[in-house]
């Protein structure tokens, strides 16, 4: 499936894990992709406060959430958790969003950036950066409705 380059906008990328959420964002012209400190994932979702602060500070207009699909493109248990979290974020943020297949993004960030055995969350934010770079190259365009997810 071929996608056209997404329209100009500043995007937040999230690599959602069970313990941490890696964050990265890009400028509206897709020239730079920067990482942000990873967030500890809270049971009561208090991390949403910091996510909202990043959105305001960097004037972000949409977000993407990585889905760790299996090699055949099927949903994994972690992908289901990421999907649920992405829908939660949409309801909280009311911003256009999309899901992106992030199969092997952690492996790629470990190899590409040489970060191993990281407990700080750096690898999570580097994975969010890779997910965002992939989205910039491949799409899909952001959607405003949860029911219109694209992978």
UniProtKB/Swiss-Prot annotation:
One of its GO terms (cellular component) is cytosol. Keywords: Cytoplasm, Hydrolase, Nuclease, Ribosome biogenesis. One of its GO terms (molecular function) is nuclease activity. GO terms for biological process: rRNA 5'-end processing. Pfam families: RuvX. Its main location: cytoplasm. PANTHER family: POLYNUCLEOTIDYL TRANSFERASE, RIBONUCLEASE H-LIKE SUPERFAMILY PROTEIN. Could be a nuclease involved in processing of the 5'-end of pre-16S rRNA. This is Putative pre-16S rRNA nuclease.
